[in-house]
Amino acid sequence: MTKCAASSRLALSAVLRNVFHSQSSKLGASITPYRRPFASVPLFSSDIQLQRSFGSMPRLCDSQNEQPEPAVPGTLTVADDTLPSQHKTTKRKDYDSSGKTDGWNTHKRQPKDHGGNPENRTGRTDRERRAFRNETRREAKKEPRKWQDRTEKVKLFSENKGNKKPEHWQVQKAALKEKFAGGWNPPKKLSPDALDGIRHLHAKAPEQFTTAVLAQEFEVSPEAIRRILKSKWRPSEDEMESRRKRWENRHDRIWSRMAELGLRPSTNRTRTLSDFHVLYDDNNRKRR
């Protein structure tokens, strides 16, 4: 199939080529210093050999005449410079550290070895692993822990202790503690003469010397006065003498301590009971 020579001259590529040729001859002098300021060779030099042909529209060129036309170096140079930058960009390639193409895509991730987890070694799926973990947690919640056992035991013991009926002595002790703050065993000790005096006063005038009056007079609890009056025990002659001697020695010890503090005068009777006489003799020599 033959084509008309006139129609080939009117093709778009031929028209553009002629326009570029005419414009480049007029603007060549003004374009050269701005386009290529660092070039040592003139732009329209005949020595420049371009290695690629004008191909702004390859599809239109293929449809035209297959006979090659003489290429003008200046025209192609200007056309190459005026092309948009998007036609000059080349496809970037990914390189890995060894220089292979698409190096990042060729590496495959190796699955991590979960050696410490027994669930992964059995080849179970994610659903089976979740079910196994949930079942293990439910079983752990069912088993009571040690601190829970201790708490339950203490709770049961306290409940049993509260329900247990108190003994007779516990009832009496609670009643005495509620009635008398000092209790039935007062810290203050009464001498044998004081005990005899309490009994004598209450026997002579019971209406005048009541329990409350005697408790206030001797500075003891009413329960102590009641027990003294209720008691029927009477010591023998020997027991009375022994109690009297012990009470006198107690009095002398207290007097000696007060004398050392300067609160009581020192006497010959109490001087032998002082701490100084225990550590040193009469000649102020230390005892061995």
From Swiss-Prot:
Main location: mitochondrion
Domain of life from the UniProt record: Eukaryota
Record-level GO cellular component terms: mitochondrion; nucleus
Keyword Transit peptide: yes
Record keywords, A-Z: Mitochondrion, Transit peptide
Pfam family, one: Neugrin
Location within or outside the cell: Mitochondrion
Region (Disordered): 58-168
Ranges annotated as biased composition (Basic and acidic residues): 112-168
Family statement drawn from the similarity comment of this UniProt entry: Belongs to the RRG9 family.
Role noted for this protein: Required for respiratory activity and maintenance and expression of the mitochondrial genome.
Name of this chain's protein: Required for respiratory growth protein 9, mitochondrial
